[in-house]
Every structure is written in C-alpha cells, then in structure tokens.
Amino acid sequence: DELLKQSGAFRENQAVAERAMDSNDLERERGITIFAKPTSVEWNGTRINIVDTPGHADFGGEVERILSMVDGVVLLVDAAEGPMPQTKFVTSKALALGLRPIVVLNKVDKPDAEPDRALDECFDLFASLGASDEQLDFPTMYASGRSGWADMELDGPRKDLTALFDLIVEHVPAPAQQERKDEPFRMLATTLGHDPFIGRLLTGRVESGTLKAGATMKGLSRDGTQIESFRVTKIMAFRGLTQQPIDVAEAGDIVSIAGMAKVTVADSIVDPEVTEAMEAQPIDPPTITVTFGINDSPLAGRDGKHVQSRVIRNRLMKEAETNVAIRITDTPGGDAFEVAGRGELQMGVLIENMRREGFELSISRPQVLFRDIDGERNEPVEEVTIDVDDEYSGVVIEKLTGVRRGSLTEMKPAGAGKTRIIAHVPSRGLIGYQGEFMTDTRGTGVLNRVFHEWAPYKGKIPGRRAGVLISMESGQSVAFALWNLEERGKMFIGAQADIYQGMIIGEHSRENDLEVNPLKGKKLTNVRASGTDDAVRLTTPITLSLEEAIAYINDDELVEVTPSSVRLRKRYLDPHERKRMAKANQ
C-alpha cells in the first residue's frame, strides 16, 4: 500500500482501501492473499513492475506461474515471528529460479520484535534451501509498513520508503528481455482474467519483440501445436491499481492482451512466424480430492439459483481454466465431479466463491491422493510449524504423533512463554485438525503447514470418534424436543430450523449414531397442572463454518452448501437404505 502511495500512483484526494492489492471479497475477509496480482509504479524515471503473490502453499499454483515474470524478489519477514513455513515454500521456488532476494524485516516497531534473530533465521533458511553464494549475500532493510518507512539501519531516520525504492532499482537487474526488442514477438500467458467489456484477458511478460494493437498473433499449446490465430483487440498495462490501454507493448513489459477465444494459462502467444512454444514452469501435483455433487436434499432449490449438474460442471471447468493447480474429472453417475487440488484452504475458498454466486452443492469428505513410487503406495506428508503457549505443547505433540501418525522433528522455546513445534504429519492426519487444535490451545495457537514430501503409507488413521444425532422426521424443529435431547449430545441447530429425515442435527455423546425426533411437541391435557412448567432454555447450538463442516464429516456423510446455510446430512437419507449400504460395505 505504501509503495503505491509514496510513488504517486494515487491522486492526493483519492480514497484508498487498506490492503489495496487484496481486491477480492474473500481476501479482504480472511486477510490473506489468494490471487497473484501485478501492478507497476514509476520511481525517478524507472518503471518498477510489482507482483503480489500468495504465501500459502494451497495457492502455490499462483506463485509458480508468476515467478517467470519477475527478475528479483522482496521477501517480507515479520521481525517478531521470523520466517514462517509458507515463507519457505515461496522462497524455495524463487531461489531455484536464481532470483536474488532483498530481505525486508517488517514490523520492527512491535514491542516483541527481534530483528537480529529473524535475520539469522532467514540466512539459515536460505542456506538450507541451497541458495548460491550470490543469493546469500542479500541486502537487508528494516521497515514498518503501517508507518510507511524503511531504512538500511535499524536506528535510521524512519521517514519514508525512498531507501527501499533506491535499493530495488540498484539491486534488481533490468529485464534481460529488453535486448530482444528486434526479435519476433513471444509471450507466455501466466494468468487469465475476465473483463465485462473486453472479454478474456491473458496476462504475462513480453519475452521478445513488440506488439501493436490490431496485430494478428497465434496461440501455441505447451507441445507447440497451434490452438488458434487471432487479432489483438486491446493491450492493457498495469498502472497503480488500474489497467490502462496502451498502443504498443515492448519486451520486458507486463501486459494483458484481449482478442483470443481459446488460448489459456501456460500457452504461448507468438508472432505467426514462430513455431516453438515457450517453456512453462511445472506445477506441483494436487494432493487432495473433494467430490462436488448436486444438492439432492428435500430443501434443494430454496436458496440458490444454480442447482443443475450442467451449470455446476461449467463453473468448475471455468475455474480449472484460470486456476492451473486444480483438476476436474467427471464421475460415472454424471451428477458429481471430483475436484483435485492442493489443500482444504483452496477447496474452501472455491466452495465459498461458488456459494456466493448462488450455487447449491453437496460436498464429500476430502480424500488424500496416493501415488505409486517403485510399486510402493506413497502419501503426501506436510511440514507443520506450530507456536503454542508452553502449557499446551504436551497435548499438541500427543495428538500429532499419536493417532495422526506424525513424527516430531524439532521443538524449541520461541520466547515470551511460547514453544515452537515442527513435525512431519501425513496430509490425511491433518484433515479436520485445525478446529481440534484451536480447542486444545484455547484459541491461542498458530498452525502453519506446507507440503514436504511423498512418503510411504503410514497406516490407518481413525476418523471422528463421536456418533451423530440424525433426524427421523422432516419439518421445523421444536424447542421442547431439542431441550429433551440436550442430554444426548451437542446440537448443531436451534429451534424453528428447517430439517429433514437423514439430516445431522447434533453430535452424540457416545460412539454410535442415534436417530431422534426433534419435532416432538409437549403433550397437553385438560387437567390443570399443580406446579408451573419449567421454562425451556436451550443451550446455544454449535455453528460450524464451511471448512469445519467439511472436516467434521465421515465418509458416509455430506455437507449441503447453499448461499445462506451449511447443513450436515447422511449420504443416504432413508434409514433402511443406510443399513443396507453399511452391510454391503462391511
């Protein structure tokens, strides 16, 4: 935000939201970056192109594509926390491409900041990732983004970001592409966007040559086959937070091009005389899969406007076009689709986006994808970094290394009464752990995870222990009935909620599932009662968020997602059919 402000990208009276680059609603709500977004600023006659990338490995597909567009990286590290696991993920990708980093220690004005320790940890991180001597000789800056200053010295003048701009201009090499202006035009498409007036927009960095609006170009797929030839209708460049049309794009520029119908991400846009496609960065394979099905519950179609499988399929295909990290396959029945992706967070974001667009879906429990390596079954293992108060470290280690089949690799004091725990845990063991972790640490723990390696299958991991309370009737729940059911377990619904047969209304206090009737009213007689009736006071029901609900269910259960509600249900609503299927699966 401050780089944009201090470079004069905004008018003086322009109102700018905080975290201006996180333009998507979900990014603003969750405070994370999901999509990689380019911008550019002008500094003393030099144009600096900036690409903001996500840190979470779930959105790693965004990072891997974008790195081919830049010549250097600025790594922002919290001076109190030091480098986090997701820092490691993005940094490893950048170092592997030979990019030279600038390390900026942010938030040095926080009371618990330890910039020297954070700097040592950065150096150790780079060394462990196999950085070259040139990369290890990185310049460091101390900064406070909120106050809008950066200095080379910790006790510098603390005025503005001039020093950072100067360092970027001096340290990051100019694009090597600029020397290839006279060659034929070539560009690799890294992101796909959509503009309501112009249509599809492909963004990338011009590798060589120049491009004028109105020129005819062709699209090549990764293997070099021609997809289509098209006329470039518009060229847009990023200036501050807006895109502005330009007439000519030169080698080294980051631009968006309109006019093509079929060319997509990782394809090359080239001059008609070029025959070879450009090399695209390989993308890490998906690790989990979730089944998206039509909502076939009795309440289907009440909230959403998109309920047919055809519409859901088209929307998922459109998503796969712009998001290279997910893969979609049809299931034999035709009314469900398997979506493979990087992690629960990425799936949660996709479902949340679709739900806001008015879709109704039924979602299955996430399954981990296995891989055969040399005839042995392997599964994805993640590195988990946890910061917790000392008193909770025991229960966290016990949970991770016990039933969840993890192995503890490091444990050290993190200062201020906290412990840092690093463990390698199979992805299967982490499904649904976030909620349990928050309960165990009373909401004080911080958990970060990143893909580590494929490792031999670690054996069975038990699912949820408690059974569920299943409604045996359809209608609206009655407070009196719920009040009587409270001794049986915790409720997920309140009074006057719409329910149907086979819907899960609560968690049973024992291990078996129990069918209950939440519609049972009080029997009234014409005999006057001697005492007064007890007033019905219900305990507040547990409300599960979308991610919690998806992690909570077992394999024979589904989450029904509509624009206004998230409900849990059994896969087979009829109790006789449930018994039959349970027998068949034994």
Regions found by a protein language model. Give the residues of each.
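Conserved Switch II/interswitch segment of TRAFAC-class P-loop GTPases
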Residues: T46-I48, T53-G60, L67-T91, L95-R117
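Gly-rich Lys/Arg/Thr-decorated short loops/hinges at beta-loop-alpha junctions or inter-strand turns
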Residues: A20, N44-I48, S68-V74, V103, ...
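P-loop NTPase switch module centered on the Walker A-proximal segment
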Residues: D1-V77, E121, L192-D195
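Alpha-helical scaffold elements adjacent to nucleotide-binding pockets in ATP/GTP-utilizing enzyme cores
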Residues: E2-L3, S40, E62-R65, M69, ...
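Accessory interaction regions appended to the cores of large information-processing enzymes
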Residues: D137-P139, K159, A163-H171, P175, ...
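Active-site glycine-centered loops adjacent to acidic/histidine catalytic or metal-binding residues
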Residues: N106, S144, G343
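Canonical P-loop GTPase G-domain recognition
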Residues: R100, D109-P173
